[in-house]
């Protein structure tokens, strides 16, 4: 399957890009994050992130489909 991945904040910094298209056999955000975390060296544990698919927040075991847009959102701070 092909996915459009969007990264924000420190994840985008670490990946060196804000988005990428990736071919993967991952069938859940959990599996896809494990793959890209290893590839890009992401340090965040999955429990600290939010994930959205096609504009809606979903759980880590949500079933992915070809051409889904997947967004991994790290915690942000500010004031």
Regions found by a protein language model. Name each.
Residues 1-78:
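Ubiquitin-like/PB1-type beta-grasp interaction modules and other compact soluble beta-rich domains
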């Amino acid at each position: 399957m092909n996915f459009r991945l969007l990264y924000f904040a420190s994840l985008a910094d670490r990946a060196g890009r804000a988005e990428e298209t990736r071919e993967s056999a991952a069938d859940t955000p959990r599996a896809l994050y494990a793959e890209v975390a290893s590839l890009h060296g992401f340090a965040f544990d999955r429990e600290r992130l939010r994930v959205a698919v096609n504009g809606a927040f979903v759980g880590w075991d949500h079933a992915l489909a070809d051409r889904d847009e997947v967004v991994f959102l790290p915690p942000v701070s500010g004031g």
